[in-house]
């Protein structure tokens, strides 16, 4: 194929239905030289097969970029330290992968001299915003092509028909129509019968987990160790980031931990439903939260809760590269200085419970809280504290009493 004088476009390529169709569509519609880029963030894929398929479908080049460790250290761990959870449930597995993927697409586009980046996110979803916000933040001169917003294919069924017509092999059929996103942190399931919120999801969709009902009848205990908010060891064994998360995924998944079925508010204004499996991440969040309870004071804990909510919203909305996000990271990092220690978790039938914790920087002091005889806390001191603490209440009560007495006297005079 002659590509010498063609403009180049970098396509975020997964080898799945949408991007396989988009690759061929870009050639037909724009006449671009298509460079496929598959970013490995820990998903279980045959990357050699993906590269082969991209080239066979018409790509002039196919990049396979493994950024799994960078994903964990630079994206997952900061979000973990922030305690960021979207709408109380979602651990942001898809959300924080998009800025890193977009960053790599920009790097490849700049290296190849491409004029555009294309992606397979739909016009109804959050990912289009996450991809494009990052691309605009890193290189505003690159054109962005989002076929789902412009082409005549209106459904995944249409894409299947297009693929069949063009001889593109695809991994789904009209009977298996779930849309999935996977990385080392989680896997999500959307679409199909999940679009009706009255339909209970079937546990046959699970990829990382067993259902809680089918998990072992005896609990498993696991001990996690943290250093300044970062997990460093499992059951006393030091792990590199990838091996650690792989180990925790197996542990949590075996007990049905980390499965959620939620209806969430998308950035674009609609609600969507998804089933998410985040076994290892659920363990890390539970342990980190327990350790913070041991090491952070009350005011910091309270204030950080608000920061966590805002942080989660920024990540969910794709605003990773913003001044506010950078500022929040500085605050979060300052809170993690003493979040060091161990937490023991109990895994049982889908539940993950922190049952023990210890830290050299613990603010929990048994000498002060004991119900037995103690020699460090003078309980008589509490009286003066309570008098001052409740002084506003006392003053208000005296004012009301005086006012009521005055009104009573006026009534007698009348």
Curated annotation (Swiss-Prot):
Gene name per UniProt: argG
Pathway per the UniProt entry: Amino-acid biosynthesis; L-arginine biosynthesis; L-arginine from L-ornithine and carbamoyl phosphate: step 2/3
Organism from which the protein derives: Alkaliphilus metalliredigens (strain QYMF)
Any single biological process term in GO: argininosuccinate metabolic process
Record's subcellular location: Cytoplasm
Pfam families xrefs: Arginosuc_syn_C (PF20979), Arginosuc_synth (PF00764)
Keyword terms of this UniProt record: Amino-acid biosynthesis, Arginine biosynthesis, ATP-binding, Cytoplasm, Ligase, Nucleotide-binding
GO molecular function: argininosuccinate synthase activity; ATP binding
Binding site for L-citrulline: 90, 95, 126, 130, 179, 188, 264, 276
Quaternary structure note: Homotetramer.
EC number(s) stated in the UniProt entry for this protein: 6.3.4.5
Annotated residues for binding of ATP: 12-20, 120
Listed name of the protein: Argininosuccinate synthase
Domain of life: Bacteria
Assigned GO CC terms: cytoplasm
Main location: cytoplasm
Substrates-to-products reaction catalysed: L-citrulline + L-aspartate + ATP = 2-(N(omega)-L-arginino)succinate + AMP + diphosphate + H(+)
Family: Belongs to the argininosuccinate synthase family. Type 1 subfamily.
Transmembrane segments annotated in the record for this chain: none
Residues annotated to bind L-aspartate: 122, 126-127
């Amino acid at each position: 194929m002659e590509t010498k004088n063609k403009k180049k476009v970098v396509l975020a390529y997964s080898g799945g239905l949408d991007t396989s169709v988009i690759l061929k569509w870009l050639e037909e519609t724009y006449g671009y030289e298509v460079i496929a880029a598959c970013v490995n963030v820990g998903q279980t894929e045959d990357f050699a097969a993906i590269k082969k398929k991209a080239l066979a479908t018409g790509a002039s080049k196919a990049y396979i970029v493994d950024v799994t460790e960078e994903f964990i250290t630079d994206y997952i761990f900061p979000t973990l330290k922030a305690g960021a959870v979207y709408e109380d449930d979602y651990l942001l597995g898809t959300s924080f992968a998009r800025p890193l993927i977009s960053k790599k697409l920009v790097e490849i586009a700049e290296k190849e001299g491409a004029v555009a980046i294309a992606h397979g996110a739909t016009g109804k979803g959050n990912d289009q915003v996450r991809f494009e916000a990052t691309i605009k933040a890193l290189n505003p001169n690159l054109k962005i092509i989002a076929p789902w917003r412009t082409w005549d294919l209106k459904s995944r069924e249409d894409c299947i028909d297009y693929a069949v017509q063009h001889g593109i092999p695809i991994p789904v059929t009209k009977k298996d129509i779930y849309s999935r996103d996977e990385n080392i942190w989680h896997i999500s399931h959307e679409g199909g019968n999940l679009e009706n919120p009255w339909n209970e999801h079937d546990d046959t969709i699970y990829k990382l987990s067993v259902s809680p009902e089918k998990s072992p009848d005896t609990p498993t205990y696991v001990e996690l160790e943290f250093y300044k908010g970062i997990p460093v060891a499992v059951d006393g064994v030091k792990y590199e980031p990838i091996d650690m998360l792989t180990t925790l995924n197996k542990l949590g998944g075996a007990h049905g931990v980390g499965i959620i079925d939620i209806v969430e508010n998308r950035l674009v204004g609609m609600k969507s439903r998804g089933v998410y499996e985040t076994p290892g991440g659920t363990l890390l969040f539970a342990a980190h939260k327990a350790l913070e309870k041991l090491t952070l004071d009350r005011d910091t804990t309270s204030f950080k809760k608000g920061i966590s909510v805002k942080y989660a919203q920024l990540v969910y909305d794709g605003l990773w590269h913003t001044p506010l996000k950078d500022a929040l990271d500085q605050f979060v990092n300052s809170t993690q200085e003493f979040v060091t220690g161990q937490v023991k978790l109990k895994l049982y039938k889908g539940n993950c419970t922190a049952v023990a914790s210890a830290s050299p920087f613990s603010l929990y002091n048994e000498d002060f809280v004991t119900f037995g005889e103690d020699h460090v806390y003078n309980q008589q001191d509490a009286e003066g504290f309570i008098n001052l603490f409740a002084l506003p209440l006392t003053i208000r009560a005296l004012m009301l009493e005086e006012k009521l007495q005055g009104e009573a006297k006026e009534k007698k005079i009348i």
